[in-house]
């Protein structure tokens, strides 16, 4: 089960017949809608298509609205594209002109007031570098420092300069309101500079009674410098390496990425690593070796999610890119499974819910639980568990579909819909049964269950229970699990403590339950449906006999002759080393 989540950007490539369905079916956790491009009508068409597919396939794929943000872009060239040459002059102007090789209009009217001669301007994610020569009220005359082609509406970055433009434009307001009204799950807020930028969006969402969660995209120096206050304000953060790698010295980028991921752990917030992760797959069917390492290293660092941009939005191999990223993640996680994050000495006082989540993760590790099951109204308990990166999968049982989708972004969480429970016993039974029905738990396995008491009160996570799944009577080690024909059997229990009891009571087809076996007992073992033995060891007489005679066998079933009632109908499951009582 892949624990690192994957975000895929939708676009022209995913509009092709069947592509979006393939993305949903092959593990896309979050669908990104890039509102820097396209109209509301265009995005709504894709959103409606996504909703229909996720409903049909039963996949809780979240929808993420990525805002345009306070960005600056070129307007349009007469020919759509121009080639700039090193040494020539090129003018950025706030006047409305037809773009040529010498001049082009920009979208931000006050840029001439924010820059100075000698400063640097980058075009198209830094592919073309300009040095400012002179500035007047409308024009910024620059020297081109390297050759390159430039197209319509490419980005303009001004590294190290605080822009006086307001954070939220009218366009962004309209887009955010659209997202709130349509039922999007996340807002990815572009170019967040301070915590106040996040609060401004939160206040707007509150006006529309929206529970959309906010992902703060870190794309400039101000965002990096204010990362702690931004993490405190936002619901998640994204290392948006495209613009960030232009706004800062690119040699700083790897260290900043690692630091932001590390800081996100301290705040218990999901962290997304994005931009150019499999960029070559826009045109090629396979990634470069460097891209494979890039994805893997982000996972080694502990990122919650990884993102595909142009690879799925406009690439030639969108489904292949997703499958490739998923395969890299799964393989990397096999070697990185022990990344449990302990509480550190300088953590300070934490909440009861946080302490309970940490204790649940430790308990699951100590008892080798198959899963951690949590019941949460808001999803916050599941996110706290995710913060500690336990080895066990986190099965989050929630009551609201939007909460289920929003948990799709968090590392290691599998969210399931569950009706409201009315008591603690009902909560435990319903949640573990739901996990079992969906194949995440099996009879005889241990689950660590955490929830809040009293039931139904949000924010009161304070209970941990170690729960044995099913009507389990005994557990041990299954023998012959590699042979699919002998992994399970059912029958009436014949509980015997001596060979004389076996001779007196046993009938063919029974499940023989004994302290140990011997050569004198082999004829009875041969006629038994299954064998349950208290003596441990895969080299024990019972283990060898059971394997040789192709009998479902569980050894090391401590207390089996005491816990299993003679004549009871039982099921022996070698795959999980358990003996279950069958319902009458």
Regions found by a protein language model. Give the residues of each.
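C-terminal helical cap(s) of enzyme catalytic domains, especially alpha/beta-barrels
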Residues: 44-50, 202, 312-335, 463-467
């Amino acid at each position: 089960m892949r624990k690192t989540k994957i975000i895929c950007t939708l676009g022209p490539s995913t509009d092709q017949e069947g592509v979006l369905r393939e993305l949903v079916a092959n593990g896309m956790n979050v669908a990104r809608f890039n509102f820097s491009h396209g109209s509301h009508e265009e995005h709504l068409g894709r959103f409606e298509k996504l909703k229909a597919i996720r409903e049909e396939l039963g996949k809780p794929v979240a929808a993420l609205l990525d805002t345009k943000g306070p960005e600056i872009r070129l307007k349009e060239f007469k020919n759509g594209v121009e080639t700039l040459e090193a040494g020539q002059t090129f003018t950025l102007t706030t006047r409305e002109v037809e773009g040529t090789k010498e001049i082009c209009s920009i979208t931000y009217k006050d840029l001439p007031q924010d820059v100075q001669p000698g400063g640097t301007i980058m075009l198209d994610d830094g592919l073309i570098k300009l040095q400012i020569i002179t500035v007047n009220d409308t024009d910024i005359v620059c020297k081109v420092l390297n050759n390159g082609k430039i197209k319509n509406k490419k980005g303009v970055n001004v590294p190290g300069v605080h822009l006086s433009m307001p954070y939220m434009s009218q366009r962004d307001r309209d887009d955010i309101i659209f997202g709130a009204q349509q039922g999007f799950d996340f807002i990815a807020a572009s170019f967040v500079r301070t915590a106040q930028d996040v609060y401004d969006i939160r206040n707007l969402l509150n006006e529309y009674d929206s529970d959309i969660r906010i992902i703060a995209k870190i794309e400039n120096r101000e965002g990096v410098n204010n990362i702690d206050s931004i993490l405190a304000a936002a619901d998640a953060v994204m290392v948006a390496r495209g613009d960030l790698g232009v706004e800062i010295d690119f040699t700083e980028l790897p260290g900043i990425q690692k630091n932001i991921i590390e800081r996100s752990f301290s705040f218990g917030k999901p962290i997304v690593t994005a931009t150019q992760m499999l960029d070559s797959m826009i045109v090629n069917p396979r990634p470069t070796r460097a891209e494979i390492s890039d994805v893997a290293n982000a996972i080694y660092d502990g990122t919650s999610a990884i993102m595909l941009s142009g690879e799925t939005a406009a690439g030639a191999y969108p489904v292949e890119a997703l499958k490739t990223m998923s395969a890299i993640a799964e393989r990397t996680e096999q070697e990185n499974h022990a990344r449990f994050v302990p509480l550190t000495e300088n953590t300070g006082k934490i909440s009861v819910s946080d302490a309970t989540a940490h204790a649940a993760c430790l308990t699951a590790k100590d008892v080798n639980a198959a899963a951690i099951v949590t019941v949460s109204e808001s999803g916050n308990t599941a996110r706290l568990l995710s913060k500690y990166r336990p080895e066990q999968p986190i099965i989050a049982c929630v009551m609201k579909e939007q909460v289920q989708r929003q948990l799709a972004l968090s590392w290691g969480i599998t969210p399931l819909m569950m009706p409201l429970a009315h008591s603690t016993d009902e909560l435990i039974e319903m949640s573990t049964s739901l996990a079992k029905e969906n194949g995440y738990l099996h009879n005889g396995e241990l689950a660590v269950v955490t929830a809040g008491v009293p039931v139904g009160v949000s924010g009161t996570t304070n209970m941990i229970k170690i729960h044995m799944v099913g009507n389990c009577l005994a557990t041990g080690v299954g023998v012959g699990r590699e042979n699919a024909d002998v992994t399970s059997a059912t029958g009436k229990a014949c509980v015997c403590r001596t060979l004389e009891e076996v001779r007196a009571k046993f009938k063919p087809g029974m499940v023989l339950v004994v302290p140990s076996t011997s050569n004198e007992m082999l004829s009875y073992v041969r006629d038994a449906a299954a064998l349950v033995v208290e003596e441990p060891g895969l080299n024990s007489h019972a283990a060898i006999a059971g394997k040789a005679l192709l009998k479902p066998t569980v050894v090391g079933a401590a207390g089996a002759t005491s816990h299993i009632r003679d004549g009871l109908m039982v099921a022996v499951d070698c795959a999980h080393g358990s003996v279950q009582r069958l319902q009458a």
